[in-house]
Amino acid sequence: MRVDLFDFDLPEALIALRPVEPRDAARLLRVAPGHPLAEARVRDLPALLRPGDCLVFNDTRVIPARLRGLRARPDGSSVRVEAMLHRREGPDCWRAFARPGKRLREGDRIRFGSGRDGSACDLGHLDATVAARGEEGEITLAFDLAGAFLDEAVARLGELPLPPYIAGRRPADARDAADYQTVYAREPGAVAAPTAGLHFTPDLLARLGAAGIGEARLTLHVGAGTFLPVKAQDTEAHRMHAETGEITPGTAARLNRARAEGGRIVAVGTTSLRLLESAAEPDGTIRPFAGATDIFITPGYRFRAVDVLMTNFHLPRSTLFMLVSAFAGLETMRAAYAHAVAQGYRFYSYGDASLLFRAEGR
């Protein structure tokens, strides 16, 4: 499909720079094909879902994945390098998007320096070698540390990777360390938050449980590729970067049981949906999953695992707007987004949310 079909006008002022307080006070637009748009708040979810439905949360935890360092030149001078880690390849290896990526070569040594507070990790620095180069500034870094030692150094030296549309307008600060993390985050490894989950509070989770609405957890480590613009003119020419995830046998069994008993699978965020669809059999059965997925969902895709999707409002021409258009219908979503813009809904990672019901036959 032509990428320009997914374009729309979005005033920059509608891109949220901070979340609302409390988290569940965010606006929620209910979008059900064949029904009028309905406005609510995230805190109203217990009344918008049914007993027996099962919410699926992505419990990945955002790591401080932006590293700044220096590459030594042959003449003794140095060049500043910024690396955004996006996918772990092994105990000592990460794929990263680097700037200036085109000027780096295999074998180059990079020394990542002091931490955010000006202090150093125990060794004073973190060294890495450029092990491979990819496209669009992507490199593979082989670090001199591995495993938990590498994790500790990255946690000490790295910076929180706010999305570009926010980071371009203000720097990350101490408040983001809490705001850009779900209350149920558990498994470290993401470089972007599963942002639909940012709206949930312990109180809301308790009220959902009291209403007979179940919950399940999976893990998909969101990569920096989620921020990349679609440069192709046709969706068939766009390549998704792989992300790693896991659905345990217990989670798969819980979800299959919920559906067998008449409940709906409610994905909290596009990351949960993408992993569920990657793990689903043609008959809708969800199997355990451990590995990488690069699933790219556009209109025409037949959904197998997910009945309802809660997700934030996405940017024009993004793979995420393509996904929601596949789920609820392109014209339905264009109308919903036009309404959201006209009514001043807040967009993107810190913005408001929508509750989408899958269109018949999709």
Swiss-Prot record:
GO terms for cellular component: cytoplasm. Transmembrane segments: none annotated. It catalyses: 7-aminomethyl-7-carbaguanosine(34) in tRNA + S-adenosyl-L-methionine = epoxyqueuosine(34) in tRNA + adenine + L-methionine + 2 H(+). GO terms for molecular function: S-adenosylmethionine:tRNA ribosyltransferase-isomerase activity. InterPro entries: QueA (IPR003699), QueA_dom1 (IPR042118), QueA_dom2 (IPR042119), QueA_sf (IPR036100). Its EC number is 2.4.99.17. One of its GO terms (biological process) is tRNA wobble guanine modification. Coiled coil: none annotated. It is found in: Cytoplasm. The keyword Cytoplasm applies. Keywords: Cytoplasm, Queuosine biosynthesis, S-adenosyl-L-methionine, Transferase. It comes from the Bacteria. Pathway: tRNA modification; tRNA-queuosine biosynthesis. Belongs to the QueA family. Monomer. Transfers and isomerizes the ribose moiety from AdoMet to the 7-aminomethyl group of 7-deazaguanine (preQ1-tRNA) to give epoxyqueuosine (oQ-tRNA). HAMAP family: QueA. This is S-adenosylmethionine:tRNA ribosyltransferase-isomerase. It comes from Methylobacterium sp. (strain 4-46).
